Amino acid sequence: GMHFFELAGPDLILGFDADPATRNVVGLIQADPELALKAVALRKFGQEIIRLVAGRRIHPTFAVPGGVNKSLKPEDRDTILKDIDEMIDITKLGLQIFKNWAEKNKEDIEKFAVFPTGYLGLTTPQNGLELYQGDIRLVGQDGRELEKFDASNYLDYIAEHVEDWSYLKFPYYKKMGYPQGVYRVGPLGRLNAVDHIDTPLANEEFMRYRSMNDGKPIENTLHYHYARLIETLFAIERTRVLLDDADILRKDILNTRHDFKNEGVGVIEAPRGTLFHHYIANESGLIEKVNLIVSTGHNNWSMSKAVDSVAKTYIHGQEINEGLLNRVEAAIRAHDPCLSCSTHAIGQMPMVVEIKDMQGNLINTLKRG
């Protein structure tokens, strides 16, 4: 919710070419104060869940080895439940805003960083959307399943390519090699990797989403925003399902057995995509080896491709302007990497765009930040 309203909202609601002095969250508040308040309410709802479940909003210490350190109180459960209908309405409003924008900007959507890849995400046994447990499902460019595997075996399926121009590695599907085996994660990746969603409102919207390309994967980078809102709807509906389960109030929250296991692999879906955490420790509990593949890494190839595609689509001749730079930035921001928080919060992402002729001679440069 925060990403759509506060980070992507300035582009979609105010426009890619709006004055950068107002194309930010402050400008959004000035343009539509009521919408801004609803966006803040959705953000607050998520933060309150963290506080009530984990004890505090910032750096909670909820998860501990063997379980969690706090059970949920009945009154806290009821506090969360009472706001769910309002949060669903706010998310539906966001969906309507996006669809209205998409209707008016079809040309941009169809040419803004549209390219095929594979898609990867956690799924239920029936290939439904999952965020916390299940198997990893990888589908190809045509949407057909390539693999479905337990995350602990990720190294059998995923390798990482190195380019001399990037500090970040490029994960890919081993059997297809690089770059044929690259894939996307996050909202677009997850919704392309599943067949349905197990909550009614989100699944209804998901069916509309998938129908845009006759059931085949959605390749349009700007539809990351659409997928993100559908997932927000799912998360809110799923929250209600969990809170309505009596087991949510159980007090047995910690497994006190101490069977030593020196190696573990964890996987989870963060908002921006799939996280693999792989740890090896000695008998004293000291971590000796770590391997992480985080969502910004999974999406490294697609973000690079998106920047290249947007620049080639929107640069004509030698002229480049601030609106172009913002589109390049928006291509990165749609994937929601860790650096997206800085792109609207404090103003502008430092950026240099160079235009070269066919012989490689530099003919124009635009810098900012």
Predicted segments with their positions:
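Active-site bordering "gate/hinge" segments
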Residues: G1-R272, S284, V294-G369
